[in-house]
């Protein structure tokens, strides 16, 4: 079964790139055509690269790896936090602090400081060893730490993989990952540099629905990897008898429904494949809206 369908990519606007004047020539091989001054990404290639990235993330997690979800732009913040939390992975969705990977020892100290502040009962002024003003300052410090480091509170070492939304905005994360030889899986819009990414996924990194879809796909890969890891640890290949976590149950139920719909999907596949060129013809009005949004 495919990880994601052509119809899902089209409906989410994954094929819309940037304006033709804002592009990276290295992305030329991923571009299908141009409409109303906007590049249209080749979704056939996107499907192939999604499958490749999915298998890599799944295998990495199955062997004990951790995926750090990174996306601080407004369109990605909610999806990054939601999907990473769903599969128990760390995330950064507010601000990338310089040295978060390359100077992880210092970051770990700040995380420890955050956990210490969380032990304070800020409402019990009389029972604490602090004055009201000191408690106010400590609460502000805690709020700032939770905003910047809350998503990586359980990260004890450098992650195995980075999932990044918008490599241009998250260039600090990309640079640090390259220094530590950490593989990067990322959405590549038409203004990005594909040479910076180990597992690129050509697509729209500005539309909320596109970011949501691709981030969910990566989270599903993590979920499958965690299930495989658990089965390897228990020496079983069947689903465990104990109650499954919510994300495991959703994933397995989703797999069953996809298998049940396989015959219908097989009939729709040829039609969906033909929709990619047709979509390019039908995007004139939508491309105009995307132009205004960019």
Swiss-Prot record:
Keywords: Ribonucleoprotein, Ribosomal protein. InterPro entries: Ribosomal_uS2 (IPR001865), Ribosomal_uS2_bac/mit/plastid (IPR005706), Ribosomal_uS2_CS (IPR018130), Ribosomal_uS2_flav_dom_sf (IPR023591). GO terms for cellular component: cytosolic small ribosomal subunit. The keyword Transmembrane helix does not apply. SUPFAM superfamilies: Ribosomal protein S2 (SSF52313). GO terms for biological process: translation. This is Small ribosomal subunit protein uS2. It comes from Arthrobacter sp. (strain FB24). The lineage of its organism: Bacteria, Bacillati, Actinomycetota, Actinomycetes, Micrococcales.
């Amino acid at each position: 079964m495919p990880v994601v369908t052509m119809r899902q990519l089209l409906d989410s606007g994954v094929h819309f790139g940037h304006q033709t004047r804002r592009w990276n020539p290295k992305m030329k091989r991923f571009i299908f055509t141009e409409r109303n001054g906007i590049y249209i990404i080749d979704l056939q290639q996107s499907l192939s690269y999604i499958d490749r990235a999915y298998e890599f993330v799944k295998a990495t997690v199955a062997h004990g790896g951790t995926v750090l979800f990174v996306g601080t732009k407004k369109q990605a913040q909610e999806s990054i936090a939601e999907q990473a939390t769903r599969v128990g992975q760390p995330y950064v969705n507010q601000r990338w602090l310089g040295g978060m990977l390359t100077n992880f020892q210092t970051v770990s100290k700040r995380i420890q400081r955050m956990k210490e502040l969380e032990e304070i009962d800020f409402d019990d002024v009389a029972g604490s060893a602090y004055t009201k003003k000191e408690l106010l300052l400590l609460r502000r410090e805690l709020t700032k730490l939770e905003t910047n480091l809350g998503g990586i509170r359980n990260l004890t070492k450098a992650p195995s993989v980075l999932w990044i939304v918008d490599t241009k905005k998250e260039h600090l994360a990309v640079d640090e990952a390259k220094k530590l030889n950490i593989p990067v899986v990322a959405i590549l819009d038409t203004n990005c540099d594909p040479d910076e990414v180990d597992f690129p996924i050509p697509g729209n990194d500005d539309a909320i629905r596109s970011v949501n879809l691709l981030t969910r796909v990566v989270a599903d890969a993590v979920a499958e990897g965690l299930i495989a890891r658990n089965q390897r640890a228990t020496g079983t290949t069947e689903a465990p008898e104990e109650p499954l976590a919510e994300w495991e149950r959703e994933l397995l139920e989703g797999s069953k429904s996809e298998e049940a719909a396989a015959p219908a999907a097989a009939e729709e596949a040829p039609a969906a494949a033909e929709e990619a060129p047709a979509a390019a013809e039908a995007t004139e009005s939508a491309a105009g809206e995307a132009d205004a949004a960019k």
